[in-house]
Amino acid sequence: LYDQTDWRYRTEPSCGTVAVTPCFGTIGTAPGSSVRNPGPQTDNSSFYQDTWRQTKQLAFFASVDYDLIPKVLTVTLGTRHFKFDNSAAGSVTSSFGCYGVAATPQGCFNPNYSYNLNAQNLSDSESGFKSRGNVTWHITPDVMVYYTYSQGFRPGGFNQNGGSLHATGPDGLPQFANPSSYQSDELTNNEIGWKTELFSHRLQWNGALYQENWDNVQIAFFNPGVTGNIFFNTNGQNFRIRGIETSIVARVMDGLTLQASGAWNHSEQTNEPALIDNVPGSVNFGKAITEVCDGAGQNCSPVGSPFGPKGSPSANAPPLQYNIRARYEWSVGGYQSFVQAGVSHTAHSYTQAGANPTLAQAGLTTSRLRFELEPYTLVEASVGVAKGNLNASLYVENLGNSKASTFTSTDQFIVEETPLRPRTIGVTFGCKF
């Protein structure tokens, strides 16, 4: 996978072969790096990354079903072996460190602010087994209960700014080196559920109770005041998620169908990791970073753990969601008609699982703030008619014109919100061929 991204917004003039400030040297790629466009970039390039990433995956799986009691009690066992070989290389170049630098045939590449990924030897391998077990019991032909145990994971990867030093301590030395890579995180699921069809199949009721353990969770950091002005990923929290979900479909009478589904879950951080001083020789090496100072080790300011305290909820995880819908269909004079209405609700959630503040404060070191997303309710309705291969419908979405943000971020130093779609009224026409 190749990635070439060029941020062309520099307005200062470029330096010539003899630098006369104010000017910037034209940035170039890391010497000897594996890039597709080597050498100097455009005169207005402020940042440029020319990288590639390769993942080789080998996997095989097996699954066996065995009827302990034919058509009544079945056991399923399965496993998957995986092997990932990951590697990355290339150049990530910044115009920092290029102010007043004379032009050269190779372009300006300052290793204090830019990164030669080839020199970091970014390669690793992961392998192992992830398995699944299931027991299914058909109490009757229309009532089934089950238990499932399953495992999953998300592969790790590399950071483009690995090894860069930040967070000066009271001894004047950096306390944190950005990690070159991050590991996979893992999910273990235990679930008990049921599936039923009752009252001559006029009522369908399904549901499940579950507990998920999500460990070594991958998390992205962007904290210019502590860990530099480039995103990097690492591993941190463990979460336990417990919940219940259910759905009902009821054919109340000919033509009338009611549907409802809902889920409640409680997510909780079960550990309390910290950002650890990982620079040998620094005064607090191996301990949690609790303060950041100026370059001389003076004027220190306290910093908290960005991972958040034990008991915090996971990100973007509303504790309650539900929807209810009713649909009535009938026929008159060869026309198939319907009317439908529904309501859905999403409870509040948080944009991050960490401990970042919800409002900008004096001395704040990060632009990645934590926001609470307000709960919202949506109402929709539609009516339609069809005959032969033609159909038409009238619909309205977000009937109450609810206003809420589905995601809020300050990563770009301004508050950005993704709003709900406003009330929308429309007409559709269709023809089947």
Annotate the PLM regions.
Residues 1-4, 77-83, 145-151, 194, ...:
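Transmembrane beta-barrel strands of outer-membrane/channel proteins
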Residues 10-50, 86-124, 157-181, 219-235, ...:
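Solvent-exposed loop segments that connect transmembrane elements
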Residues 56-64, 129-135, 178, 188-192, ...:
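Hydrophobic, lipid-facing positions within transmembrane beta-strands of outer-membrane proteins
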Residues 62, 66-68, 127, 135-139, ...:
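Residue-level signature of outer-membrane beta-barrel architecture
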Residues 69-73, 140, 187, 199-201, ...:
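Outer-membrane beta-barrel channels and translocator barrels
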Residues 138, 144-154, 161, 174, ...:
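Membrane-embedded beta-barrel scaffold of Gram-negative outer-membrane proteins
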Residues 208-213, 232-354, 428-432:
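Gram-negative outer-membrane beta-barrel transporters
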Residues 255, 333, 343-361, 384-433:
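C-terminal beta-signal and adjacent terminal beta-strands/loops
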